[in-house]
């Protein structure tokens, strides 16, 4: 069995693309090998400047392969059939037919003789390199090849020998390179073991997972040695492992004067911008230290530490300056600046948006002074110096500035949390923050839909799907008593150019997002049954789904559903009009069914008002016996058309009782 070693050596590959490339190239090479009847054990390694493939257990030769080649249909013209035969150098006698989608087609078997693996590997490798699709890629120079970053070298060795291969301007060789900063020299290798060892000797750790383990261990060791703690941050560890070929963890100091900054500013400056790790004391307070990952072990580590301390100090000095500039003003004084910030070219400026949000909040919770104050100031930090420099701190800085202005904690928290949730994994806000978040998201959703920014299959630039899901989650998880239709109507009326068409579009869009929210926990037919009755009260929708799912899973629920379906099937699409007339009953079963209906109707209405859907289903269950008796003893058809109509009305009214909780005809 043979071994293949391939290294694509390039300029720096973006860290966030590396893990996907590792998985992607593994899948691509594995699939292409299998398609060519080459069964090998494949591994892929990725780092800042290289993607490496190691394949073992390759055969020396390929297996003979028979491939069925599809031709024209049996009804095709003689010229088309002859053309197919000529193109593939076969006679018509060699063709056979095969049925595909009720249509017969001509086929022939193309036989591929066994070939030496090394003869076909170059074309397979080039196909695989091109087949993986990077998130972003580029051309460079005059070369007609496209990759994530300019390729500088290709190493390709098969069974200890260079595999003759040309990719664009590059010819395969047996050369790799060591660490960019400390050992950037040509290194000749013979096989994978030699390759891996020589890279290690020249300060390159090939395996991504091993680099991550080294970083984790280094972080913990330094944190523990200073009696400090570090919060788990696997995403940042993964990112810095993609920036370093030989990671070494070092510790730097933060001047104490910068600790007066809000902790989120420190974290944003360090984590997001510098890729540094924050440290905390045992009480959870921010410590005046940070950890960072150096790309290599240098003789003068102190010089490296001083350099990183200097870079961080400069960034924090800017942040401290911005912070002091901002707290010299009040949030309220920033309101006039919002006039100069466009929300959307068709929807006006941010000050107008703030006014709409405030109106919606006043509609949702009249006389809630804290909520109205939070609504009025919720966007004021967007024009602050700090948020201008650190956009990810929107809302958070509003919280600190509100506290500095002497506003209540409830107001400050609402300003901070009103952007939540920012994804499925994010918690929803509560209290006034939940109401403010709902108002903000409703205004954005309604306004942007009116402006023609509805999501399409190819994009959702304003994240309206996420906004809608946020509204749904906030209402359900906070059990907010809000009528979604009324809320949309109110919001639409705050815009001058709106119409019923806009309302229908928005409600339809929200309904689809409601289905998306529930689809993982409930059958779509049950979701449709509940939503087709009403999607206005999301708390009720959630309670109904939960109650109905449990009920219909039981034997009693299944029996009641079957009884409903018997009644519903008899009515079908008929338009039944007229009241039930007790004087037209001719059987005891009719009388009993009608009596039970009249008895439970007011109780069902009261239970629905109280959202006691379990009681509603228990009341409906009392119809099972009389419905069963009706179908056992009564024929709907009768010589007297009045009696027929009355019986149909009785069944219609029976079904309508079920429809007070859900459209059972959708189940």
Swiss-Prot record:
Gene Ontology annotations of biological process type: arginyl-tRNA aminoacylation; glycyl-tRNA aminoacylation
Compartments in which it is found: Cytoplasm
PROSITE patterns documented for this protein: AA_TRNA_LIGASE_II_GLYAB
Pfam annotation, one family: tRNA_synt_2f
Keyword match Metal-binding: no
EC number(s) on file: 6.1.1.14
UniProt keyword Protein biosynthesis present: yes
Reaction catalysed by this enzyme: tRNA(Gly) + glycine + ATP = glycyl-tRNA(Gly) + AMP + diphosphate
Keywords: Aminoacyl-tRNA synthetase, ATP-binding, Cytoplasm, Ligase, Nucleotide-binding, Protein biosynthesis
InterPro entries, alphabetized: DALR_anticod-bd, Gly-tRNA-synth_bsu, Gly-tRNA-synth_heterodimer
Molecular function terms from GO: arginine-tRNA ligase activity; ATP binding; glycine-tRNA ligase activity
Subunit structure: Tetramer of two alpha and two beta subunits.
Record protein name field: Glycine--tRNA ligase beta subunit
Organism (species): Rickettsia canadensis (strain McKiel)
